[in-house]
Amino acid sequence: MAKFKYKTQMYQNLYANIKNIYSECAQAAKEIGIADELVKLKEEGRGTFGLTGGVSGCPAPLRDDVLAFSEKEAKSVKGLAGYVEEIRYMVKDFYGSDYDACPVNTCEAGINVCYTSMFMPPVMGAGDTYRARYIAPYEKHFHHQGGYGRPFPPKYKDIIANRGCTAGELGMQGKRQPMLDVLVTKLEGADYSNHGIQYFPATMLSGVKGEANRAVFEEQAARHATMFSGITSIGYDTPGYGYGDKDADGTPILQKVLADVAHKYDVPYVVDAAWCLPFVGHDIRKTGADAIVYSLDKASASSICGMIIGKEDIMVNARRAMGFHGNRYGSLSSYGKAVSVAFDPGKEGLCGAIAAMRVLKDKPEIMTKPVDAMYDIIVEEFKKGIAPELLKGFTFTKTYGSCACEINYEHTWDNGQMGIPIFSIEDMYGGTNIFQEGIGAMGMIPTIAYDGNIYVSTGLNTLDDTGALIPERMRLAIRGLIALINITCKYAGIMD
């Protein structure tokens, strides 16, 4: 395959050969044994399998314990406020009495509740409403945590324009809150080079150091002090997400820095931890965050439900917004009839959350043990399947906090050389992310694989009904991923 002078030429050639790549992927699936495994799963009525845990558009099968509790409670007549209270006291048992909980129907709903009740300026009262601005690092998944304000500076006005299935007011634009701006803040040590078939800036963050960014956020906060209302970030803990620089306790230093800056100005620091586990992952006590939002149907293996956990004082805002904080006549708990009542999770979501959180709190090894086995399979298969000169640019990071293994290949581009193709998140939404669509061509469910970072996790029929890893099936999935990388590299001109 021809070598290319410019990376734009490489991505153009990939696009021109996309059908050939997917055809070779389908053939590889047969040779590896993926196709045969898919036949077995379909005969069992279990659909397909994949490289990820449950996602919004494809929830994971429920474990036996979650399913059993949900089925039992489905036949019980109880007020939903009682379930909310049980969740509340699990959180207090683990984090301490100064913390509280607020269940919601999805993680995105939780972010909406937090930003509306904690970042957005008040809209009641005579006269004009003032503007407020929250700080968001320019990092991965920015369209979630960074999508609720008008971007500042204006050069970022289209930063999330191509990140959604629906354009305009009912798509990403519709998340923007009244009189709220988002301060897009580049990270020191990050690489925002353009990549992908859609050729947008990628967020490559393995070089980010926590303390090196303190001055960046201090300056941003000081510059906008009169309108500064909060800080947000994601809650992951791996190098590819910019949080590989940690203290002696394993806490990402950048998250502690963000908390310090927020508290200096007496504004909240809210963490989007969609793919993290409460009790196991991001520890709000160590980072200093004020509130953290989870998607329990992802890594936590619950039915569809979101969860806000935070410090009691700021959680009054969220719980009142959801109608959980008690009736006006003095009750200690209630359910619904507040501004964000449309975000309530319902009985099925609450029961799944309770069952999943019990395991995370009391038997976390059920969730973490499969991660060890998955990591070993990934490292073993990549050593066998990826050319040594390319493998030098990979890093593999295991994270219990997300039940995942991060496969980062940013450094295959070191020293000015052409590396393994990097696809942007715009490629994902545009259907041109070959590292995701190619897995689909093999018949499997892909995982997020953009910005030089592939996040493999357990869940989509790679665990049995008790939550134990099915190693043979996970190995097939990883071999499929490696085959896809090699096929793509051939058409990228970086290997024969």
Annotate each PLM feature:
Residues A60-P61, S333-G419:
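Structural motif of enzymes handling amino- and sulfur-group chemistry
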Residues M1-A81, G96-S97, A441-T462, A468:
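N-terminal "arm"/small-domain region of PLP-dependent enzymes with the aminotransferase-like
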Residues A26-K42, G57-V66, P201-T203, D266-A273, ...:
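Short charge-dense sequence patches
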Residues D36-L38, E43-T52, A126, P151-F152, ...:
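Short secondary-structure transition/capping segments
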Residues A2, K7, Y11, V77, ...:
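Conserved PLP-enzyme active-site core in the AAT-like
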Residues K40-E44, S70-S76, G230, G288-D290, ...:
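Short N-terminal helix-initiation segments at or just after the protein's N-terminus
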Residues A2-K19, S23-E24, D376-G493:
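Conserved C-terminal alpha-helix-loop-beta "cap" of PLP-dependent enzymes
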